[in-house]
Regions:
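Acidic, serine/threonine-rich low-complexity disordered tracts
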Residues: 27-146, 195-302
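Alpha-helical transmembrane segments
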Residues: 14-18
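C-terminal motif of bacterial Sec signal peptides marking the signal peptidase cleavage site
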Residues: 19-23
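A surface/extracellular/periplasmic glyco- and lipid-processing/surface-interacting theme
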Residues: 133-202
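Positively charged n-region of N-terminal signal peptides that target proteins for export
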Residues: 1-8
């Protein structure tokens, strides 16, 4: 029962709130995304997935793993294995991919960002999401942006459909894949950061534009396996911006809290900006309220 509830929870999190959304803002500095790989070529992160009760005690039956990779591509490159598609002759950009495993269910997500304005800013160009249960694909999505139009092809249990989500006149718009990693590069990340944006949502049951709000609630220190592995962070942990993500019309009260490192983290001679140290999301099961927790274990850069 618990595993079935978790699968439903994670599906909602990805499809509605997104284990990842992707971000861009062409009108204000508040949402502009710096080129996160401007001085290196690759980053990867591994998270341990688990559930906790209100006192922080572990809840059995919810363990999993989540990995994220970021890779730089040059102008004219071919990106293979982009969901069910291959991207040919892409603009200079960054591919962000995620892989979440919970029980026998796997979630594959990805976004390709084009680099614009003299190699300074990231703008989402393509996205995909694939869900497998017991090795079988139950949902897939491949999409491309044409301005503020999100053109998609979706397959649900073998039935294919296509459509367009029009974001209209919104100023800030975001994609629903790899959002968490993308937010690391906002140029105005601070304790006073608060803004709203729209994003296209395409799930098995929905295809629409929704409003999302991000707000930094303050600074907190976080300790986990990642901080324990580093001599410079073992004692006090790492200072993080505690950031709340919520949907204007929430589904079953779903929201997320993200913890981004305040300062750069040195790795292999380079600095990683605002790494995502932890994700928390509340859920209810068996009459109790728990939290799904994604805790950073390892990070690599080259």
């Amino acid at each position: 029962m618990k595993k079935a509830i978790l699968i439903a929870l994670v599906a909602v999190m990805i499809a509605v709130m997104g284990v990842s959304f992707t971000a861009c803002n062409n009108a204000t500095t508040q949402g502009q995304l710096q080129n996160i790989l401007n001085d290196h070529n690759h980053e990867s992160f591994e998270y341990a997935v688990s559930a906790q009760d209100k006192d922080g005690n572990p809840v059995a039956g919810y363990d999993g793993s989540y990995t994220v990779t970021l890779d730089k591509y040059t102008q004219g490159s071919t990106v293979t294995d982009f969901g069910s598609a291959t991207l040919s002759d892409v603009k200079k950009g960054i591919l962000v991919k995620g892989h979440l495993t919970v029980g026998t269910t796997e979630y594959f997500t990805g976004s390709y960002f084009s680099i614009i304005s003299g190699s300074s800013y990231m703008v989402p160009a393509y996205s995909f999401r694939t869900i497998k249960k017991d090795g079988n694909v139950t949902f897939s999505l491949n999409a491309a942006y044409d301005g503020k139009k999100f053109n998609y092809t979706r397959t649900v249990d073998g039935k294919e459909s296509s459509g367009t989500v029009d974001l209209g006149k919104v100023v800030n718009y975001y994609d629903n894949n790899e959002f968490h990693q993308a937010l690391r590069t906002i140029t105005t990340f601070s304790e006073s950061l608060a803004f709203s944006f729209s994003m296209p949502i395409v799930s098995a049951t929905e295809a629409s534009s929704v409003s999302i709000t991000a707000r930094v609630l303050g600074k907190v220190n976080v300790k986990n396996a990642f901080t324990d592995s580093r001599a410079d962070l073992q004692d006090g942990g790492i200072a993080c911006y505690k950031t709340a993500i919520s949907r204007a019309t929430e589904v079953a009260g779903i929201s997320q809290t993200l913890f981004y490192a305040v300062g750069d983290v040195a790795m292999s001679g380079w600095n990683m900006k605002h790494i995502l140290v932890r994700i928390q999301e509340p859920f209810k099961a068996d009459g109790n309220t728990y939290s799904m927790v994604y805790d950073l274990k390892t990070a690599e850069l080259h």
